[in-house]
Amino acid sequence: MDLSAALEFLRAHNINLGVNNALVAWRALERGIRVQGDAKGRVRMRAYGRTMRFKHGWTNLNPRIVGRCTVNKDVTSRLLRPRGVRAPENAFFGADDIKRAWAWAEPILPVVVKPSNSTKGRLVYVGITDVDDFGAAFASVAEVFGGALVEEFVPGVEHRVTVVGGAVVAATRRVAANVVGDGGSTVGELVAEKNRQRADGSNPIHKYIALDSFADRELTRQGLTLQSVPSAGQRVFLRATTNLHTGGDAVDATDALTPVDIQLVERAARALPGLKLGGFDVLRPPPGDAGEPCVLEVNMSPMLSMHHYPWEGQPREVASRLIDVMYPETADKDHRLE
C-alpha cells in the first residue's frame, strides 16, 4: 500500500481525508489491525481487545484533561515553569483591556501578540516594539477571538518536536515562508515558481505561499517589494512566523537535537498528566548562545506528516511509533532516541 492507496481506503470507509489519517491507517493495516471509520469520520482501530481512534493528530490515547490543560497557551506555560521547563511569560487580555495589555507589555518589549489557542500560525504578530504596532495587532486578534495573548519574545530557532509514549521521536525545524534568490528573478516570480513546485503533488503537506498583507509587512521589514530582485542565494521571507499552514518549510532536524533538548522536552511531556502524543514547539538558542531551550506551546493534534514529508532532510517514521504505543504487541523494536 502507498499513500494514494491509503487515501482511497479512507474514502471507501467513510474516514475523513487527510495525510495524517492516511499514514496512521496505512501503518495499522500493515500490521493486521482492523481499521474502520466511525460516526465522526475518525480512524477507528481495533485489536487485542482495545479500540483506538485517531483524527488529524488527535487520539484517544491522550486523556481529556491534557487537552484542557494545553488548549490555552498561558495555562500551558504556568504548568511547565514550576516543573523546571523554561516557557515564556504571557498573559491573556480581553478585547477592552488594551491599555492594561500595553502596560504589561511595555517593560518587556519586544513582544508577541497572538490568539490564546491554536490558529495554525494565523494572526500571530511577532517582534512588536511600539505602541502603534501593538494596538493594531491587538485589535486584529481581539476582533476575531474576543481578546489576545501577549507574550514575551524569546529569540531562538523554532522546532517542532514530537513526543510519542513519553519519548522524543522526531524533530522538524520550521522555516517561515521564503524564497531564495537566483540573481535574475523578482520576489514575485520566485514565489510563483515555488508555488508551482508545491502544486505537483510530490510533497503533499506543503502549502502555497500567499501574497497578502502579512507578506507585504515582512517584505517591508527587509526593505524589499515583490518587484525586488534578490541576489543569488539571498533568502527572502514572506512571513514572520514559521507555520507550515502559511507556506513554511519543514526541514528535518532530528539529528540536531542535543541531549539537553531531548531531556527538556521529555520533562515537559511528563508535566502534562497522561500525555502520550504531543507536538512541542521549542525555541532552541541561536548558534553560539549558551541559553536553555524554551517550550512555546504544546499541540495535542500534532502534524505527524511533516516528519514523513519534509521539504528538506530525512523522512522520519512517526506513524509507526504511534502504532507501537497503541498496540505494543505489534512493535518490533525500541524507537526511542538515544
PLM regions and their residue ranges:
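C-terminal active-site "lid" helix and adjoining low-complexity regulatory extension at the edge
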Residues: 249-263, 270-277, 284-338
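A long amphipathic alpha-helix within ATP-dependent nucleotide-binding catalytic cores
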Residues: 193-288
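ATP-binding N-terminal substructure of ATP-dependent carboxylate-amine bond-forming enzymes
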Residues: 1-71, 75-78
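Generic non-transmembrane alpha-helical segments
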Residues: 27, 31, 83, 104, ...
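A short beta-strand motif that forms the metal-chelation/ATP-contact edge
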Residues: 44-54, 160-170, 288-306
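Active-site nucleotide/adenylate-binding loops and adjacent lid/helix of ATP-dependent enzymes
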Residues: 52-56, 61-209, 259-262
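Short, surface-exposed charged micro-motifs
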Residues: 32-34, 160, 281
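Short acidic (Asp/Glu) and glycine-rich catalytic loops that position anionic groups and cofactors
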Residues: 3-5, 241-247, 297-302
